[in-house]
Amino acid sequence: MPDKHAFLSPSSAERWYNCPPSAWLCEQFPDLGSVFAAEGTEAHSLCEYLLGVYLGRKDLTDPRPGLQYYNEEMEECCQGYVQYVTEIIEGFRKAGESPAVYVEQRVDLRRFIPESMGTSDCVIVGGDQIVIVDFKYGMHPVPATSLQLRIYALAACELFSALYDFESVRMVVYQPRIVNVDESSMSVNDLYAWAEQDLHPRAQSALTGKGDYCVGSWCRNCRARRQ
């Protein structure tokens, strides 16, 4: 289940990547949260439970009795997510692979983004490919090329490259409430080149408060904008 966001969190990457000084500016204002964020957190906890049950885990507690925003729509969305993930898993198996599956996997982003950690919804490794699936319960469209997902893909490669021999990264956004399922792929080498040449320098600028303010679509969730 997602936990407290890091200073340079993947979820806010679109903002601090494009407008580095906004990272420290937003620290001056409280994060008041929202009903939408609370709904998303609860939906993620249900996804984690349902997918864990499918994978045969016996140590899980059904979160539904304690979910404030649980309803039929949330159940259908989370069940759909599990079905989609299982289809990816079965696809690997039909190809003769034995995929490894990691649910709500804690990842370390600090090599490229100082002081940053995160949690990836689902990581699947099979053959020469690693797949990162990002569940979105919100209504704002999110593409598979989002910085958040690319950063989680990078972190997954960092974590699992010593265990598995994969060459390509497949990034998937599953956003059921607006019927958005989007995919993007790239080579591991290209992902690391982007991280070293682009992501890391921008993260350093954000951490030190350098760079220029820049207005764009990433201002939508900026805390400073709301003041």
Residue locations for each model-derived region?
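Short, polar/flexible loop-turn hinges at active-site or ligand-entry regions and domain interfaces
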Residues: 29-36, 139-143, 160-162, 209-211
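Substrate-binding beta-hairpin/strand module that engages nucleic acids
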Residues: 154-195, 216-221
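Cysteine-cluster motifs in flexible loop/terminal segments that predominantly coordinate metals
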Residues: 19-23, 204-227
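Short amphipathic alpha-helical face segments that pack within enzyme cores
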Residues: 42-45, 147-155
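Non-catalytic accessory segments flanking enzymatic or RNA/DNA-binding domains
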Residues: 100-101, 107, 195, 199-204, ...
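Catalytic cores of nuclease domains that cleave nucleic-acid phosphodiester backbones
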Residues: 49-148, 158-171
